[in-house]
Structure formats: structure tokens, C-alpha cells
């Protein structure tokens, strides 16, 4: 590998600030795709921001009639969640079939969705479930129309 700055973010704002001034900053979720890509020198970020320290991005909970899965929730956590097994059994089963135990215990749903990883077919499952994905903007814009984040149906 090569030299880069590493930051372990403690909040979304901290992660965004860590990317300020980066020419090729990358966000690290589980690292199942990014780290091998960096080792092969196919990606060479000048700043690597680890999201593992952001507790608000982890976990599974029910809010009204919705199941909310945080981006930093691992495949194993999705697979083993009693709530997901009860409410969305197909998603629990999908998560249990991803990779091997090491990948399931480290890889995250957010990393797989953001990377559109074909070996973890969450995007197709999200479309099939008519899920809503909430994102966070990672740039600043002078336009007042831009928001801090956005919500979009997965079928959009």
C-alpha cells in the first residue's frame, strides 16, 4: 500500500469534516471491497475515514411500520436479527448467504449498497422490498436546493 491519512470518525459530521480538502477521500465501512482494492492499487485515497466509530449508523430497530437498518450493520447482524427474521425473512436469509463467516461478520449493508457489490445483492432486495434508502451528501454546494441528506425509494 501507500501513504494516506486515516481518521476514525465519531459522528457523521466528523466524517464529513475529515473529508474536507481530500482529493480522493474514501469512506471505510466493513472494508471487504475497499481494502483489497487499495492493496491492488486500484484505489489510492489520500484520506481514509473509518465509519466504525459512529454508533448511530449501527443497529436494527422498528419505527412505526418500518424496519430501519443502519448502514454500519453487518451482514451477520441482519441475518441473526429476530426482528428482521420475523418482519423480512427474505432479507435475513439473503444476509446469511453472503460470502463466508468472515465477510458476514465484517461486511456491512451500507458498504454493499454504496458499492453496488454484486456478491451482496442488497440493491435488488431493496427494490423488491420497496425500501427507502437514506443517504448523506458528502460535498458542499452553493445551491440552496441541496440538502444535508436525502431519502429516496430504492426503485427510483
Q: What is the meaning of each model-derived region?
A:
Residues 1-141, 145:
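C-terminal structural segment of proteins
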Residues 144-146, 150-156:
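Positively charged, low-complexity/disordered segments
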